[in-house]
Regions:
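Conserved N-terminal phosphate-binding loop of PLP-dependent enzymes in the Aspartate aminotransferase
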Residues: 2-6, 31-506
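N-terminal chloroplast transit peptides
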Residues: 2-18
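Adenosyl-5′-phosphate
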Residues: 21
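Ala/Thr-enriched low-complexity intrinsically disordered regions
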Residues: 24-26
């Protein structure tokens, strides 16, 4: 089983299949009644003939792929893009093919490609220095740094978390969140005294007590990044972890819910109870092993691992367990954050009485970082640090993105468009149960299972040939990660195309 899984990933068959396109043409879609953005855009971009396919005889993509592969392994590359011509929900490749993008750079495009408001922002003379000069924010921040943080990230700070540290990506956000948790936990144990001489000396040779043997509890199927600490908590695909040394940290089972939910209420409650019991057992077990669990990390929806959901009650009880055992509760909102579930942060759906202790973000937030409670504040400079600590130009862009989200009510749009998408997927499941099962989602953060990875990959390939970009996750799931400007008519457009694909699928 393990060798088969590894062989599949080493072969990268899924990535390769993206490039084996065959000429196909979907009829152009006249979208003159619906602009690429809610905000007016230049006339040439108003109507995007979204699904037209122009398979040119001399394909630029093949040449570019060969060039890139000379200098690095390019097997993961799906295709090369023309971002100058991409607008709104439509991505254009280097050969001129326009596609409805329902994957949006692995869920990292908040308000569509080349949004006119963002283009206008970067053209304003007073903003030029912010894009040209990238400061070492930890020691030499710009004069307006605090102001821009208040206008951007702090304006959407999750409940109970007043402290903020910016980073560049999701992995470094989680990695430094782990460090923050370990320092907080050791400070609790140390009390008021400072560092001992023994601690200062032993930490330099990676030994206790200077380097205590703490752990972070994670869940099977999780994905939290590819750096060393994050990789120890990532359990989605073997190819991510093979050959890399790691830590002996506890891994709990994540609920595997049965669908439709309303037909398996009792079974799903029992499944969640089983997983929660295992969490507590592992915390006790690792305490006895002298590998104390300092924190628990969890995704609101396991994304890379297969879009695995759990009930709001599961997360409330998980938070209670963390508090009971003195563990920090870390919520990874790298992929779920930014509004795609219908709330700005997916964990807001849970209704926690006691907020999470730490929450990481990236992707749609255009920068990385983490919010945390006051008690997790580092007690000395340089303990959480790197050269750039993010990028102030991204805070400038994010402030405008948040303004647009609020002005155009894009959170409610995500909820409504997501309902249209989910309803349509349920209808397709009823009509084609041999291809679609376990339809699930929150907002536009939707997915379904296919019979196996071969069928999944083939469906994604055919969809791209018909002008739609989809993403895979887990062993056999297809996931949807559209932008926040994904509207009802985009959902209907996709559903019509995918219905035809399923009708002809063999």
């Amino acid at each position: 089983m393990a060798s088969m899984l590894l062989a599949r990933h080493l072969a990268c068959s899924f990535q390769h299949s993206y490039r084996l396109l065959v000429p196909a043409a979907a009829p152009p879609v006249n979208c003159s009644h619906c602009q690429c953005f809610h905000t007016p855009v230049p006339k040439k971009s108003d109507c995007y003939n979204a699904m037209s396919r122009h398979f040119l005889e001399k394909r630029k993509e093949d040449a570019l792929m060969k060039q890139l592969n000379i200098i690095q392994n390019a097997e993961a590359v799906h295709f090369f893009c023309n971002y100058e011509e991409s607008r709104g929900n439509y991505l254009v490749d280097v050969d001129g093919n326009r596609m409805l993008d329902l994957y949006s750079q692995i869920s990292s495009v908040p308000i569509g490609y080349s949004h006119p408001a963002l283009l206008k922002l970067i053209q304003q003379p007073q903003n030029a220095s912010m894009f040209v000069n990238r400061p070492a924010l930890g020691i030499l921040p710009p004069e307006n740094f605090v102001e821009k943080l208040r206008e951007s990230l702090l304006s959407v700070a999750p409940k109970g978390m007043s402290q903020l540290i910016t980073m560049a990506c999701g992995s470094c956000s989680n990695e430094n969140a782990f460090k923050t948790i370990f320092m907080w936990y050791r400070s609790k144990e140390r009390g008021q005294r400072g560092f001992s001489q023994e601690e200062l000396e032993t930490c330099m040779i990676n030994q206790a007590p200077g380097c205590p043997d703490y752990s972070i509890l994670s869940f099977m199927g999780a994905f939290h990044g590819r750096t060393m600490g994050c990789l120890a908590t990532t359990h989605s695909k073997a190819i991510h972890k093979i050959d890399i040394p790691s830590f002996d940290w506890p891994i709990a089972p994540f609920p595997r819910l049965k669908y439709p939910l309303e037909e398996f209420v009792k079974e799903n409650q029992q499944e969640e109870a089983r997983c929660l019991e295992e969490v507590e057992d592992l915390i006790v077990k690792y305490r006895k092993k002298k590998k104390t669990v300092a924190g628990i990390i969890v995704e609101p929806i396991q994304s890379e691992g297969g879009d695995n959901h759990a009930s709001d009650d599961f997360f409330r009880k998980l938070r209670d367990i963390a508090r009971k055992h003195g563990c920090a509760f870390l919520v990874d909102e790298v992929q779920t954050g930014g509004g795609c579930t219908g709330k700005f942060w997916a964990h807001e759906h849970w209704g926690l009485d006691d907020p999470a202790d730490v929450m990481t973000f990236s992707k749609k937030m255009m920068t990385g970082g983490f919010f945390h409670k006051e008690e997790f504040r580092p007690n000395a400079p340089y303990r959480i640090f790197n050269t750039w600590l993010g990028d102030p130009s991204k805070n400038l862009l994010l402030a405008e993105v948040i303004n647009i989200i609020k002005r155009e009510d894009l959170l409610n749009n995500a909820a409504h468009a997501g309902k249209v998408l989910l309803t349509g997927l349920l209808d397709l499941q009823a009509r084609y149960p041999q291809f679609i099962s376990r339809v699930r989602g929150r907002g536009t953060f939707c997915s379904f299972d296919t019979p196996d990875d071969s069928i999944r990959n083939k469906l994604i390939l055919i969809a791209r040939n018909k002008g739609v970009v989809l993403g895979g996750c887990g062993d056999k799931s297809i996931r949807f990660r559209p932008t926040l400007v994904f509207r009802d008519h985009h959902a209907h457009l996709f559903l019509n195309i995918f219905s035809d694909i399923l009708a002809d699928f063999k």
